[in-house]
Amino acid sequence: MATAALLRSLRRREFATSSISAYRTLASNTKPSWCPSLVGAKWAGLARPFSSKPAGNEIIGIDLGTTNSCVAVMEGKNPKVIENSEGARTTPSVVAFNQKGELLVGTPAKRQAVTNPTNTLSGTKRLIGRRFDDPQTQKEMKMVPYKIVRGSNGDAWVEANGQQYSPTQIGAFILTKMKETAEAYLGKSINKAVITVPAYFNDAQRQAIKDAGAIAGLDVQRIINEPTAAALSYGMNSKEGLVAVFDLGGGTFDVSILEISNGVFEVKATNGDTFLGGEDFDNALLEFLVSEFKRTEGIDLSKDKLALQRLREAAEKAKIELSSTSQTDINLPFITADASGAKHLNITLTRSKFETLVNHLIERTRNPCKNCLKDAGVSLKDVDEVLLVGGMTRVPKVQEIVSEIFGKSPSKGVNPDEAVAMGAALQGGILRGDVKELLLLDVTPLARGIETLGGIFTRLINRNTTIPTKKSQVFSTAADNQTQVGIKVLQGEREMASDNKLLGEFDLVGIPPAPKGYCPQIEVIFDIDANGMVTVSAKDKATSKEQQITIRSSGGLSEDEIDKMVREAEMHAQRIKNARHLLISGIVQSTTIYSIEKSLSEYKEKVPKEVVTEIETAISDLRAAMGTENIDDIKAKLDAANKAVSKIGEHMAGGSSGGASGGGGAQGGDQPPEAEYEEVKK
């Protein structure tokens, strides 16, 4: 009986690894898998992110926020927010690179920001789709501890550990974290998503978000506006009426007017500011703390990056606390030092002082709200409900201003941190056909058109036009015998083309020479899809020659750059996979060594010396391999150790068999045979 038990306990265990497939390919829905069968239920939580998963058809909803991000998925008819590996329902939109070059995303990245400020990247969503020379970019450079540099294409990029990264690439790291959070919960690989953007994002910024999704291995099924997504979440329970969504988040502000009727969500108008949010509130408070310390101590902290990072975190914490208390203490010991010794910062901040510091920012929300109401053609009394979305709407002064603007107290019917992700998941359900009773009709936030004679901006599609939409207009040449026409595609609301944003340009060539404005008829067609992305084509009606352009941005990422970033994402993912792989295999190895040594101690005197030596050598080799990061070598040494220890069972089984037959003769064969057992795998 004992021998059979020993044989079962020493049964050779498998330490299997499945092949690693491409982790970040645009067409692939495969995720690297690693599942050690030896790890029991106790370690299942560790193994789960890298266990084999079937391909899932779910479309997850992701709110890629400036400060925090959130992911949700449909469960039946309702969206569910998914907790991340730290147990939180939102994830900080922070990416960091430590001294070893390892990538950290979310809470781990945020925790180490104080000691590693120059390599910790936060708020990079505000840089997405922006040029380095943009005044807003130049302003942001003065407020962040990391470097903002000029990319090879003229866009604003960031630098960490001596490497340059596109803000799109940083967004992809965060999207990857959201994707993995969903996969860990669902137990399936995910490659489809609906991602939200600020309603006032332009074409270049929307394209950058799609590129970020591609780098993260996601097929972005739809880009939808954040306030629209929040309204979807609010109205999914058959609520109807005219709704205003006031969305003040970490980096952007949007306001939208929607009409909800019989499951149809029709956006009437939208407006906003892509550079107004919680980051600006933090910066205002940060500047106050720096000036106060300089006034009292005579020391300027604005050049001390470590001190600034501590001040920034203290400012964010104070801002949050003042939403529920009338005052808070900011205490930062050893913030700096001079010849007289260490210096400490101790300031008591009242809510009224905070409101004074940020009042100019809150006031900036008034005009977009008024313009949105005007564009929607509705009056204040027509608005049935005002929804608050975004963490900054928890600030009492913001709620007070909203009440003043709309003449009614705002509703708190949605979670301001989660409503957008839930709405995105609902849109995913609509696209998949799981949710049939809801229909979303969104709008384009800004006018689109081309430059015509005299530098005039000629609109083809007005702002707040329901999308998808397609509009065309016929133009002619501006000079005699003109054989080529340059088409400049613009977005904005100003009358002069030069005052609006240039989205792209292309040439239509091969036009037959003719007097200006007489014969050539050139049809320009603007086609905006449901993502708000525009394709522009120009066609000479006489020759049927046609040229078109899908707007990316004046800079943007090329296909080669995206492919390169996909490969870099694979490398980062592989490093993370290896680290977790080693962690779990370490548990496996320790457990195996303990079991082998226990068996060897018990049966050492009953087996040949060469078997004992072989086992001891195998254990020694396995311990040595554990000190490396060579997974293949570790697996080989583990297999060798299991093979060596199995010889104990073989020798004991042989000895037990002979003894049993001899004993059986002495006992007259009266002993029942030892029962045989078959292991049942559950």
Swiss-Prot record:
Pfam families cross-referenced by the UniProt entry: HSP70 (PF00012)
Transit peptide: 1-57
Keyword Acyltransferase belongs to the record: no
MF terms (GO), sorted A to Z: ATP binding; ATP hydrolysis activity; ATP-dependent protein folding chaperone; heat shock protein binding; protein folding chaperone; unfolded protein binding
Regions of compositional bias (Acidic residues) in chain numbering: 673-682
One biological process term in Gene Ontology: chaperone cofactor-dependent protein refolding
Gene Ontology CC annotations of this record: cytoplasm; mitochondrion
Location(s) in or outside the cell: Mitochondrion
Residue span of region Disordered: 649-682
Residue stretches of biased makeup (Gly residues): 655-668
UniProt xrefs under InterPro entries: ATPase_NBD, Chaperone_DnaK, Heat_shock_70_CS, HSP70_C_sf, HSP70_peptide-bd_sf, Hsp_70_fam
Keywords: ATP-binding, Mitochondrion, Nucleotide-binding, Stress response, Transit peptide
PANTHER family hit by this protein: HEAT SHOCK PROTEIN 70KDA
Family: Belongs to the heat shock protein 70 family.
Alphabetical list of NCBIfam families matching this protein: PRK00290.1, prok_dnaK
Protein name: Heat shock 70 kDa protein, mitochondrial
Gene: HSP68
